[in-house]
Each structure stands twice: as structure tokens, then as C-alpha cells.
Amino acid sequence: KMQEGKLDGVFLAAFIGQGKRDEASLQEAVQKVTGLIEGIRKQAELNKDLCGIAVTNQDFIRLKNEGKKAFFIGIENGYGIGKDLANIAKFKAMGVNYITLCHSYDNDICDSSTHTKKEWDGLSPFGEEVVKEMNRQGIMVDMSHASEKSFWDVIKLSKAPIICSHSSSMAMCKHDRNLTDEQLKALAQNGGVAQVCLLDRYINEDYKNASLTDA
């Protein structure tokens, strides 16, 4: 499909839904994400004549010149790092380029844009340490799914540009998952990027009639 679509590289996300936040559940989350990343790496190795893992833009260019597809790795939901900052370095060593801080519910890092109880009023104290460590490790901070307050907290704290990997425009479609004009402008000034999410309800409030023209 990548060949047919003339796509040279993709980000593959090790996704984990939000679960319980007791110690046992957090350890299980870390193990699940570790397994997903190992699975991506294994598939790349099994098909090394066709693709490879990319961590840098130089890796991407090398793979393209070799006629291979590039697989970048991300983690969707910081729940997957548990409460141990050392896991950030561990995942960096496994090739992770970005981590989405939360998903559809609040976690130990920050408040979500959906189903939120505004537990932290934005970024938590632990979340501040997570962002600092991600900056130190060279992992992009992804604020898709996070609450607007979480976004502002992170963009002020981060020493590196942040991203919103799959968020659309609030001005075009009112949904808590989308970004306001103020957020988009701040993101541009920060040197970061936002990628449009094509989920029907994020691009058309009458989502049952959404189409690609809405994007």
C-alpha cells in the first residue's frame, strides 16, 4: 500500500488505552507498550529488504536511497511510561521519536481534552518532569488529545518545539479534540507542527455527512 500510495515513510504508534493507575496496572502498561515496540522492530527486521527503522532524518534519507520504506516509532498515551522516568530513556533507545502525553482520559501526566475531570488543571508535577526528560532525550512532545490548559502548560515549559500529531481546527469544527486559532498560532511560533486528523467528527460537526472535502 505504501508503494502504491508513493509513501516513503510512516510513523507507527504503540498505542495503549487509558487504564487503572495503580502500580500493577502501570507496570502492565509499560510491558504492553514495550511489546508493541518490539513487534514493530521485529517486523522491520523480518522484512529488512523492504523497510527499516528510522530515528533521524538521515536514517530516512538512507532508507529512501536504498529503495526501502522508513518506519518511525511513537507512543500514543504517556500512560505507557508508567511512573518511572527511566522508561523514557529506555523507549528512546528502542527508537521512539514522540510520545503523546495522554489519550481520551486524564492520566498521571496531564488532563485530557475529553472525559476530563480536570484532575491537574493542565500538566501535573510528574508531567513537568516527563516533559523535561523528553526534551533531554530528544523525544518530541505530542499534545494531541491533551486539554487546552495542558497544551499551554507544555508549550511554556518545553525547551524544544512540540507537535500535535493528529488534531484539527476548532474554527472549522467545534470539538474538544481540536485546536483553537490561538493554539495554532502559538504552535507555529514555537516551531512545532499540527497534522490534520481526518476522523469524521473532527472535521465536520455533521459528522455522518463528513467527506474528504471537509479536510
Task: Give the label of every model feature segment.
Residues 94-148:
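Metal-dependent enolase-superfamily TIM-barrel catalytic cores that perform enediolate-based chemistry
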Residues 1-118, 174-215:
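N-terminal hydrophobic targeting/anchoring segments and the immediately downstream early-domain regions
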Residues 125-215:
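Catalytic pocket-lining loop regions of alpha/beta-barrel enzymes
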